[in-house]
Amino acid sequence: MKIRLASGRDKPVRFGHPWIFSGAIAALPDRAGIADVFSSGGELLGQGFYTPHARLAVRMLTHMGEPPFTPKTIEARIARAIDRRHGLIDEHNDSVRLVFAESDFLPGLVVDKLASTLSAQFNSAFAEAYREPITAALQNLINPERIIDTSDNEARNREGLPAIRRMNNREECLIQSGGIRFAAAIGSGQKTGFYLDQRENRAIVAGFTNGKRVLDAFCYSGGFSLAC
């Protein structure tokens, strides 16, 4: 499939932007899939996954000069993402975000490691289309006890994807973050089950509240109060 951009709409892609909105495309194809993206002048700018009828029409997978995208690219990118976070796991922390969507060149895919469980979100048409090779790569590279789908149904709706029935996916697992044990509600809780990105903030707050009485208002898992 080929997609040609409207005149003057190629600059963001040339500078590495991961998204192309429908208004930047000269003619919108009817089917979803991998597409070669061209400038209005016919220059190949890269490859992306096209989603018809979505405002965010193309999520870029490669840019100018990069090798073509293939299913094997998925495992290689997941492996690189895992390697980048290797130093974030230690004796006090067994949980971390392993894959962060466009930041790891895997659009719409979010994977959190919660102890020996993986919480995965397939929030784009690209991630859904490659669900099987993504799952196989995660099994091969990490060998988790289980992979639980915690996809964001609002995000999936924007992509024209069916909702995930989370009522059958409610699980809980014990994790360690900052040396503290937490019970993460996977599937029934917020987002992927735990706010892993607040680990450093919890440590900062604990540093200046030590020995003090603390009110943790509107808390989710009580992470900040437990850290104090």
List the predicted regions and their residue ranges.
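Short hydrophobic-aromatic micro-motifs
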Residues: 20, 37, 46, 118-121, ...
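Short amphipathic alpha-helical segments
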Residues: 70-77, 126, 130-134
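Non-catalytic substrate-recognition/targeting regions of SAM-dependent transferases
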Residues: 99-112, 128-195, 203
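A short interface-forming secondary-structure element
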Residues: 115-128
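Conserved hydrophobic/aromatic pocket- or pore-lining residues that grip, position, or stack substrates
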Residues: 116, 182, 201, 218
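Conserved SAM/SAH cofactor-binding pocket of Class I
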Residues: 202-228
